[in-house]
Structures are given as structure tokens and as C-alpha cells.
Curated annotation (Swiss-Prot):
Its EC number is 2.7.7.8. It is found in: Cytoplasm. Involved in mRNA degradation. Catalyzes the phosphorolysis of single-stranded polyribonucleotides processively in the 3'- to 5'-direction. It comes from Trichormus variabilis (strain ATCC 29413 / PCC 7937) (Anabaena variabilis). This is Polyribonucleotide nucleotidyltransferase. Gene3D superfamilies: GHMP Kinase, N-terminal domain, K Homology domain, type 1, Nucleic acid-binding proteins. The gene is pnp.
């Protein structure tokens, strides 16, 4: 393909599309640039696999450190395991792209996005999302696009398209909206307790920009002489479906109408019906068309039965406005919660139940040194003081599987719940702890990520973290049949699996802190999105009220097993003195007191120990070391060495001065050793600090009260 370039302008910021320059053997490729940020996105298709019942789409986003002019650390000096941010960006690309591929497509598809250059202004993630659509179009893959994404920021009262990092940091909103010509497909946002109307307006504002990017893609395709591929779906043999409908429809509808059934009971009842069908088919002659259709692949019977069940469940909701558990469309499942369910060795814990979904969250308070360093990120010098980790063991859905490292889903759910809590955390100056919350999904029947938000709030309050406001969350669903639309509150597993939308909304009673919307259809109108957001508010506040009946304010004290933190400020020029050569001084203080010391570049010193007395002792030592000395100050010290003309005394940790032989006594001293020996405790006064910083001490002219006070201060420091 010949090289071609096209530009689109947003508020004076250009997005440049370069086609035919790089990756000529990929199915489709584009270099998408804005400012000095450049992302290469490729799309490649290979022949389909036999016997699979899903679209094998793989999306990989990676960042090369050369993009920021950096060399990786470690022995190998090359990029290693992808950091969490790249996994989240891979998901950000996948989520709006996947629903636009035909449901029948079974070819292997791979989208690879490489950030090859990055400036300090333009985030690469939304460029990668739009680039994925362009690469797919160029690769001539069947695709119900184009699709594009933009970021919306809010600085003051003004919405901004594709804000810079600084504008995102300064604003109250970080929202990514992706859409197709058919409507909005995906929304991802973090917000500072913004009201629903602002979020809806931001989505609308962003979708207008998305439409401009879609038009630019259509123009690009036309200018390249390409056509959007719309392959006809393969013919589907209805033999097996008709057979199952004739024999099982009444039983399926009857089971779906038994609202008293629990999820396991409903699943078991449906399995009995499916097994009876399988038995009947197995008794048919081998050449029977029905048996041939059922044995065409190992999943034919199960998938067909699932599709028929999906049809009747959706019809029941649309026609009767009733769900499989008997709830109204806007009704939340029964909610209960507890705090302090684990012993106080765990700094805080919260148990949240909503229907059959159960999440146990545990909070741990750590020291500043426990913050997560993000040096592998293209944005350097970053760290996280709040961490949320989400675990989804197989027993939570009654399955047996090997336990493995967290996958993309677990990382994504954990990040969403983390984002929901961030706006209500106390400032570092008020609460200097590093905070980690782990949410264990103990039982899953839908909306576990929002259950993790609720569990996190309970655990934080139980741990004594003074959060600004409690946060709750709810997941909304959607059933769309033609023009008929039903928005479902607090979806359970089967509604998530068989529905058209998963829309998670978290926030306080003042506004939204996080939301995430994913579609299984090719787009949704703003009116339906607005309905879901407002319906979610009612659900959130209902759940929040139930949580506040368990604990309405954070505990006033932290666990006795949590570290006690003391924070002081020292002159940054004194940092080297506290650390000492090779860390000798700070290690010595730690060994002597049992306290941990963290020092920041601005001179903030955080001292921690489970025993507060140990922390105070270390604080006193550091304060003594960094105290500004004045002539006339009196200290208790110990003789460290003797020379012919005097004795050296350490009177503060790391600070030493000399007593001249003439200042040892108010009479003539013949030999220093006649008055003091190494290890002796002596009371000294600062006599002089010369222009080289050398400290001259004396034992003369010290009042008994001064000596007593110095001994007392020294005893405290010990």
C-alpha cells in the first residue's frame, strides 16, 4: 500500500494518521500521532479454528521505554512483564472493538498496539483505540465499524477533548468514550463525585468528537479506495434448534418462571432438561439429521440450548417486565454487610452480600515505603499510595480450576474498584499511611466488582481510614429487542451473560466516582445511557443506606497491630546527615529503636513502628540530629575518642564536637585521660561553631538545672 497521511484537528490539537509507512506484512497498520506521541497499531487475521464457539480475538498493547528516551532497568536491560497499565489499556481497546465483529466470526484476530514515542502531554491509550479501528478496516476484516474513542476532561466548568496529563490531574473528570455510527459502545471514567447530569453531558460531548473521528475514518477508507467489509454470515442449520424448541420450550419457560429458585437450583433444573434432550437425541438413528447436527461439534447441543434459554429469558423481561428471580426491573437484591469479621491482626475487614454475590475485603495500613513504585511506566517518578487487588477463586462459582496469577479480568475489576475509592481518600498530609485493600470474591452471581467497591468502603471504615464519604456501587444491565429497551438494576450472572450491557456505576451520595459501560451490541443512544445512570443512582443510594446501618463513620482508632506513624519535617540539606555514609546512620537508628524511617526529597520524614514508643524514640533521635545548634545549648553525651589536646564527644546521633583540654575542668588539667575516658557520659555545652562547621564544646559554666534537663532529654532519646 502506498504511503498516505491524513490529519484531524480537535481544539487546535491534531491527530495524524499515517498509512502504508510501517508493518507492510500486517493485515492492516496505521501510525497514529498527536503531538510527539505515536502509536503503531496493527490488525492481522488468520484462518479460523474448527470446533470453537467464540471469537478468538487477542488485543495486546505494549509500551517501549525508548518511547520516552529511557533504558529499562534490571540485569537484562529490556522490557519484562507488562505493567498493569498496559493490561488495562489492552482491555480499553478490546472492549469497544469486540462487539463490532460479527457474532459468527471464528477467525483468529490479533490487534497489536505499540507506543513508539510519547511526550508529556498526550496519553497514547485513546489513540490506540481509534488506531485499532483503522487497522481493522485496512485489513478488510468483517467489521460493523468504524469505531473511535476520545478522552473528556473537566477543568473548571469546561469540558476538554483529549486533555493533557496536567489537565487530567487538575480536573475533576477523566472519561473515555468510544462509539460507532450506531451509538456509544464503551464508557470508562473516574470522577470527583460529579453529579449524574455532568457525566451524561460529558458522554454527549465526547460522542460528538467520536463522530468526527468516525467520519475521518470513512473518508480515509474512501481515499484509499477500500470498502468496509460486510461478509454474509454462513448459513445456519435450524434442524437442531427446531427440535429442542419443540421439546423443551415449555419446560424452559416454566423453570424461568419459578422465581423462588436459587441460581444453583435453576442451573440444575435447566441441566436436567438439556440432559433429557441429549438422551433422546442419542437414541435416534446415527444417520438422523437431528443427531448429525447435535454431533457436528462437541458444543452444538449446549450452545443451541443456551441460545433458546436466552431467548425466553429476554422475552420474559421485555413482555412481562419480570426477571428470573421475580424482581422488578429496578429492584436491588437483598443486601447485608458486616465489619470486623476477621481478627484485628487484619487492620480492617468488611463483608458485603448482595443476593448470592459475596465479597470479603481486607484493609492493610502500611508505611510510605510500601507505596508501589511505577518506574516501569513511561511516566516516571510515580507511585501509588492506595492499592486495590481483586481475587476471583474458582470456588466462588462452584468450579474446580488451578489457581493462577491474576488475569486481565481480575486486574481490570481491581482497577475499577480502586478508581471508585480514590476520590474519597484523605490527603496524604492528614493520613500518611499507604493503604492496600484486597477483595476476595467468595461467591459470584453478578456485579462482583461493585461488590468489591462496597466491601472496600466497609474495610476502610473498619480500619479507621477517615474517608471523606462512603462509596457504593451497582451494575446495570440492558435487554434490547428491536425498539423495546429494558434497563435492569443490579444484574445477576445470567442477566449479565445473556444481556446486552454491563454498566457499572460507583459513587457517594454526592455524585459519581467511577463508571464503566460495556456493550454487546453495536451502540446505544444517549437517552438509554442517561436512564441507566439515573436508575443506578437509586440503586447506589439504596445499597449505601444498608451499608451505613452496619457502620456509618470510620472508626476513630486504627488496629493496635497497625503501624503508628509520626511525621516530621527536616531541612532537605540534613537528609544526608540522617542517612549517613552508605546508609549507616539510618540503619543504626532502625536497629537501635526498631522503627522504620522513610525520607522524602522535600525533607518529610515518616517514622513507623507498631509500638508507638519506639517510633517516638526514633523521632527524637532524628530531631536531635537535625536540630539547629545554638551556642549555649547543653547536652548529655559520650566520649568517643581522646587526643592529646582534648576529647571528642557525640552529644547527638551523628553529631560530634571536641572539648579542648582547657575546657575539661575549671582547673589546670595535665592529661585528658585524667578527667575522662572513652565511653564516659559527660554534660557539655556548645561553646562555639566555627566557620567550617566544627563544634567546640565545654564542661564549664553549666548550671545544675541545665545538666539535669540534658540528662532527662538523653534518657528519653534512649
Amino acid at each position: 500500500m502506498a504511503e498516505f497521511e491524513k490529519s484531524i484537528s480537535f481544539d487546535g490539537r491534531d491527530i495524524r494518521l499515517k498509512v502504508g509507512l510501517l508493518a507492510p506484512q500486517a493485515g492492516g497498520s496505521v501510525l497514529i500521532e498527536s503531538g510527539d506521541t505515536a502509536v503503531l497499531v496493527t490488525a492481522t487475521r488468520s484462518a479460523g479454528r474448527e470446533g470453537i464457539d467464540f471469537l478468538p480475538l487477542t488485543v495486546d498493547y505494549e509500551e517501549r521505554l525508548y518511547a520516552a528516551g529511557r533504558i529499562p532497568g534490571g540485569i537484562m536491560r529490556r522490557e519484562g512483564r507488562p505493567p498493569e497499565k498496559t493490561i488495562l489499556t489492552s482491555r480499553l481497546i478490546d472492549r469497544p472493538l469486540r462487539p463490532l465483529f460479527p457474532s459468527w466470526l471464528r477467525d483468529d484476530l490479533q490487534i497489536v498496539a505499540l507506543t513508539m514515542s510519547m511526550d508529556e502531554q498526550v496519553p497514547p491509550d485513546v489513540l490506540a483505540v481509534t488506531g485499532a479501528s483503522i487497522a481493522t478496516l485496512i485489513a478488510k476484516i468483517p467489521f460493523n465499524g468504524p469505531m473511535a474513542a476520545v478522552r473528556v476532561g473537566l477543568v473548571g466548568d469546561d469540558f476538554i477533548i483529549n486533555p493533557t496529563y496536567a489537565e487530567i490531574e487538575a480536573g475533576d473528570l477523566d472519561l473515555v468514550v468510544a462509539g460507532s455510527p450506531h451509538g456509544v459502545i464503551m464508557v470508562e471514567a473516574g470522577a470527583n463525585q460529579l453529579p449524574e447530569r455532568d457525566i451524561i453531558e460529558a458522554i454527549d460531548f465526547g460522542y460528538e468528537a467520536v463522530r468526527d473521528l468516525i467520519k475521518a475514518q470513512l473518508d480515509l477508507v474512501a481515499e484509499l479506495g477500500l470498502e468496509i467489509v460486510q461478509e454474509a454470515p454462513p448459513e445456519v442449520d435450524q434442524t437442531l434448534e427446531n427440535y429442542i424448541r419443540d421439546r423443551a420450550s415449555d419446560e424452559i419457560k416454566k423453570i424461568l418462571a419459578q422465581f423462588e429458585l436459587t441460581k444453583p437450583e435453576r442451573d440444575a433444573a435447566l441441566d436436567v432438561v438439556k440432559d433429557n434432550i441429549a438422551t433422546a437425541i442419542a437414541e435416534l438413528p446415527e444417520e438422523d439429521p437431528i443427531r448429525l447436527a447435535a454431533t457436528a461439534n462437541s458444543k452444538a447441543l449446549g450452545n443451541t440450548f443456551k441460545d433458546i434459554t436466552k431467548y425466553f429469558m429476554r422475552r420474559q423481561i421485555v413482555e412481562d417486565n419480570v426477571r428470573v428471580d421475580g424482581r422488578k426491573l429496578d429492584q436491588v437484591r437483598p443486601v447485608s454487610s458486616q465489619v470486623g469479621v476477621l481478627p484485628k491482626r487484619v487492620h480492617g475487614s468488611g463483608l458485603f452480600n448482595r443476593g448470592l454475590t459475596q465479597v470479603l475485603s481486607a484493609c492493610t495500613l502500611g508505611t510510605p515505603g510500601d507505596a508501589q513504585n511505577l518506574n516501569d511506566d513511561l511516566q516516571t517518578d510515580q507511585s501509588k499510595r492506595y492499592l486495590h487487588h481483586y481475587n476471583f477463586p474458582p470456588f466462588s462459582v462452584g468450579e474446580t480450576k488451578p489457581l493462577r496469577a491474576p488475569g486481565r479480568r481480575e486486574i481490570g475489576h481491581g482497577a475499577l474498584a480502586e478508581r471508585a475509592i480514590l476520590p474519597v481518600l484523605p490527603p496524604k498530609e492528614q493520613f500518611p499511611y499507604v493503604i492496600r485493600v484486597v477483595s476476595e470474591v467468595l461467591s459470584s452471581n453478578g456485579s462482583t466488582s461493585m461488590g468489591s467497591v462496597c466491601g472496600s468502603t466497609l474495610a476502610l471504615m473498619d480500619a479507621g481510614v477517615p474517608i471523606l464519604k462512603p462509596v457504593s456501587g451497582a451494575a446495570m444491565g440492558l435487554i434490547k429487542e428491536g425498539d423495546e429497551v429494558r434497563v435492569l438494576t443490579d444484574i445477576q450472572g445470567i442477566e449479565d451473560f445473556l444481556g446486552d450491557m454491563d454498566f457499572k456505576v460507583a459513587g457517594t451520595d454526592a455524585g459519581i466516582t467511577a463508571l464503566q459501560m460495556d456493550m454487546k451490541i453495536s451502540g446505544l443512544s444517549l437517552e438509554v445511557i442517561a436512564q441507566a445512570i439515573h436508575q443506578a443512582k437509586d440503586a447506589r443510594l439504596h445499597i449505601l443506606d444498608k451499608m451505613l446501618q452496619t457502620i456509618d463513620t470510620p472508626r476513630t482508632e486504627t488496629s493496635p497491630y497497625a503501624p503508628r506513624l509520626l511525621t516530621i519535617k527536616i531541612d532537605p540539606d540534613m537528609i544526608g546527615l540522617v542517612i549517613g555514609p552508605g546508609g549507616k546512620t539510618i540503619k543504626g537508628i532502625t536497629e537501635e529503636t526498631g522503627a522504620k524511617i522513610d525520607i522524602e526529597d522535600d525533607g518529610t520524614v515518616t517514622i513507623s513502628a507498631v509500638d508507638e514508643n519506639k517510633a517516638k524514640r526514633a523521632r527524637n533521635i532524628v530531631q536531635g540530629m537535625t536540630r539547629k545548634l545554638n551556642e549555649g545549648d547543653v547536652y548529655a553525651g559520650r566520649v568517643t575518642r581522646i587526643i592529646p589536646i582534648g576529647a571528642f564527644v557525640e552529644f547527638l546521633p551523628g553529631k560530634e564536637g571536641m572539648i579542648h583540654i582547657s575546657q575539661l575542668a575549671d582547673y589546670r588539667v595535665g592529661k585528658v585521660e585524667d578527667e575522662v575516658a572513652v565511653g564516659d557520659e559527660v554534660i557539655v555545652k556548645v561553646r562555639e561553631i566555627d566557620n567550617k562547621g566544627r563544634i567546640n564544646l565545654t564542661r564549664l559554666g553549666i548550671h545544675p538545672d541545665q545538666a539535669a534537663a540534658a540528662r532527662e532529654a538523653a534518657a528519653v532519646n534512649r
